[in-house]
Amino acid sequence: MQLITDMAEWSSKPFRPDMSLTGWLAFVGLIIVAIILWQQIIRFIIE
């Protein structure tokens, strides 16, 4: 649960150039996961 709350915290903060590497990795990871999930949903709907 801690990871989810951290991600929510990072996503609610305005983006800064000095954002920590962990924040960026979590943000990028979140986007990748969202894209994969979206593709799975689309595929499920089409079938």
Curated annotation (Swiss-Prot):
GO cellular component, one term: virion membrane
Protein origin, superkingdom: Viruses
Organism lineage: Viruses, Varidnaviria, Bamfordvirae, Preplasmiviricota, Tectiliviricetes
Localization of this protein: Virion membrane
TM regions (residue ranges): 22-42
Keywords: Capsid inner membrane protein, Membrane, Transmembrane, Transmembrane helix, Viral genome packaging, Viral release from host cell, Virion
Nucleotide-binding keyword on record: no
Name of the protein described by the UniProt record: Packaging protein P22
Quaternary structure and partners: Heterodimer of P20 and P22; further multimerizes as hexamers of heterodimers. Part of the dodecameric portal complex that is composed of the packaging efficiency factor P6, the DNA packaging ATPase P9, and the internal heterododecamer P20/P22 which spans the virion inner membrane.
Statement: the UniProt record of this protein carries the keyword Transmembrane: yes
Source species: Enterobacteria phage PRD1
Membrane topology label: Single-pass membrane protein
Function: Together with P22, forms the internal part of the portal complex embeded in the virion internal membrane and which plays critical roles in genome packaging and genome ejection. Both proteins multimerize as a single ring-shaped heterdodecamer arranged around a central channel and interact with the P6/P9 external part of the portal.
